[in-house]
């Protein structure tokens, strides 16, 4: 049974005498740092030299240091820089400056789980992963609410890693909503699978296939765009708010009949078998190896496939149609 923690389970006092060094000031970095500061904790920011985020962080009231110096000053080091650069930054700026008894925090388990970062045995390692983008983490905190989060402990040198993680989660507002216990393995593998098979890879490929099917059958690309991409937001919003039940309650009976009878023919057992292969490719580390090598080679496949989609008919039509929708912020 899932184990969930709330406000009463976390003691913010565990962090009151500590300095939290937040590395990175992007989507999660700015939100987590500001929430921690507003919770009465001492927070500093670590950024690479000449970072464009430096002025923003200073304007938000933080002392900003180069990454290595922030690590030296910190007791809790929260690593919120992109996955693909974490390993290099860890080896260069973090590992040489860690002290015994420090805690390393993450919001995604990729580099720990796949062995790209191997912390020394004399530090705690935990993960607190808010299940929303940074702007929502911040907004909910300011409204006196919070977003759900995940908690995992990879290494418990102090005997208090779980408690420190919960204290951190409370500081950013997650315990207001609930924090679910997990592992670095579970968070990493399910997160990657969701991105590849459903949220990003599965969704974009479904959109492209549907759009191309209609256009190849002679329908206007603009109409195909509305039916296969634009209206997706209406359905996703309903799913987000109330699951399958609310979505099906809100659409027409004709749409629901097509949903429940035709949908399984599109996403059939063959697709599910492919999904199992995708999951296995994540579990055995092959995807991680591919992504690491892709970055070392300056992303030739990443850049080529992205450019291809950016120049597609789907994107050209979408750009024109979105100009007709003043409610959409570009």
Swiss-Prot record:
Broad class of enzyme this protein falls into: oxidoreductase
Obligatory cofactor(s): Mg(2+)
Listed PROSITE patterns: KARI_C (PS51851), KARI_N (PS51850)
Enzyme active site: 108
A Pfam family annotated for this UniProt entry: KARI_N
Function summary: Involved in the biosynthesis of branched-chain amino acids (BCAA). Catalyzes an alkyl-migration followed by a ketol-acid reduction of (S)-2-acetolactate (S2AL) to yield (R)-2,3-dihydroxy-isovalerate. In the isomerase reaction, S2AL is rearranged via a Mg-dependent methyl migration to produce 3-hydroxy-3-methyl-2-ketobutyrate (HMKB). In the reductase reaction, this 2-ketoacid undergoes a metal-dependent reduction by NADPH to yield (R)-2,3-dihydroxy-isovalerate.
Name listed for the protein in its UniProt record: Ketol-acid reductoisomerase (NADP(+))
Gene: ilvC
